[in-house]
Regions:
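Aromatic- and glycine-enriched glycan-recognition loops and surfaces
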Residues: 71-79, 114-116, 120, 172-183
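Active-site metal-binding loops of divalent metal-dependent hydrolases
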Residues: 10, 320-321
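Aromatic- and acidic-residue-enriched segments that line the glycan-binding/catalytic groove
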Residues: 18-34, 109-114, 147, 179, ...
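Mid-to-C-terminal alpha-helical segments outside catalytic/metal-binding sites
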Residues: 2-5, 15-72, 76-92, 120-128, ...
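Divalent metal-dependent hydrolysis catalytic cores, especially in the metallo-beta-lactamase
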Residues: 62-73, 83-108, 132-140, 160-164
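Short glycine-enriched loops at secondary-structure junctions
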Residues: 98, 141, 197-201, 321-324
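Catalytic pocket-lining loop regions of alpha/beta-barrel enzymes
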Residues: 127-134, 139, 145, 151-316
Length: 364
């Protein structure tokens, strides 16, 4: 019997209230909302956040398609979100952003002001939930001292993780020594590093061009970030720190484990090291469990195969609540239990994926 359900990946849509914590000099950086001057009646309605004169999508979502309402998506009514969680059978949701999944500005001062306001807004809203809404904080990574102060504040106000992108942030990849002070403080605070799909590199291309680089800027970035951490032994440097790959599915994990082994095997016995600077490492039997890397899976993936590589102890699942894309799975509990009923996956794995593993990963 499942003792509880922790939804390891949900979202909010930022709203005007998100920026109300930008005071003093920060207030001049507040995002504003704009609409197309000549909307195409053949296309869905659109609107944008305007940040430093540049546009970023501000989604207009369908309640029917997303299975949510504006009150629950934007946390306008925390009680309504909790009521919906009750209907879904969810005890706890862990919340990630929407706008910040793609870096929205090139300017550190604007980035810091927006992230501080977001953290305070979300900390305030989740603080009204009796501990059922937990959240992942957004440090302003271009300034490490500010980042450390921000994650300390966030930990004190209900945050249970730190959002990190798998490609460059502050011009650096996740395994760069620049981030070691962040990882050291996260380890001390017992906050995991949550590598969510998305990109830390600003891109102001039109939305219609997003599909041309979609994988590289979303799932591909997250997977590459995890691989870099393993290759450069970052988990070994911080032996109590947990890392997560969020919303990229889990089918990639067997390939990454295979590719690591093949890469390392081909380097052994060479007279010189690779000009590409690929480090030599020992690859354990379960590279993910050994490195405390947790992965959110999709309930229709080849889970028996994935469990052989990742194990039962490092998989989680999220509904992608608020968003309407291929990752959305509001009924993940029923689907996992149905697979266990057919003996497709072990019942023990269902309990771990739904509750035990996210509880450990997020330190709940």
């Amino acid at each position: 019997m499942i003792v509880g359900i922790i939804d390891a990946d949900t979202h909010i849509d930022e709203t005007d209230a998100t920026w109300e914590y930008m005071a003093g000099g920060d207030s001049s950086y507040k995002p504003t909302t704009a609409y197309p001057s000549n909307p195409d009646p053949k296309l869905p309605p659109a609107r944008y956040w305007v940040i430093d004169g540049k546009r970023q999508i501000r989604f207009i979502r369908s309640d029917k398609d997303s299975g949510t309402t504006v009150e629950t998506r934007e946390l306008l009514d925390v009680k309504k979100r909790l009521k919906h969680m009750d209907e879904l059978g969810t005890d706890t949701q862990v919340i990630y952003p929407t706008l910040f999944l793609m870096e929205a500005t090139e300017k550190p001062e604007i980035n810091a002001a927006m992230r501080r306001s977001y953290n305070r807004w979300l900390g305030d809203r989740c603080g009204q939930s009796g501990g059922r809404l937990r959240w992942v904080c957004m440090p302003p990574l271009q300034n490490m001292d500010e980042s450390l102060a921000e994650i300390r504040w966030s930990k004190d106000h209900g945050a249970c993780g730190i959002l990190k992108k798998g490609d460059r942030e502050a011009g650096k990849y996740p395994a760069d020594p620049y981030f070691e002070p962040l990882y050291a403080e996260a380890e001390k605070l017992d906050l995991p590093i949550c590598i969510h799909t998305g990109s830390g590199v600003p891109d102001f291309s039109p939305a219609r061009e997003f599909s041309h680089g979609q994988f590289m800027r979303t799932k591909g970035a997250a997977i590459n970030g995890v691989l870099g951490l393993i290759l450069h032994r970052v988990p070994a440097k911080f032996p109590k720190l947990r890392f997560g790959c969020i919303e990229a599915g889990s089918m990639w994990a067997p390939f990454v484990a295979y590719d690591l082994r093949r890469q390392q095997l081909r380097q052994q016995g060479r007279e010189s090291t690779s000009v590409l600077g690929v480090p030599l490492i020992e690859v354990p039997v379960n590279v993910f469990e050994e490195n405390r890397i947790y992965i959110t899976c999709q309930v229709d993936e080849d889970l028996p195969y994935i469990i052989k590589t990742v194990g039962e102890n490092n998989l989680m699942v999220g509904s992608d609540y608020t968003h309407r894309d291929p990752s959305m799975e509001l009924e993940f509990r029923k689907e996992l239990q149905a697979r266990a009923d057919k003996a497709d996956i072990p019942r023990s794995a269902v309990q771990k994926i739904l509750y035990d593993n996210p509880k450990v990963f997020y330190g709940l």
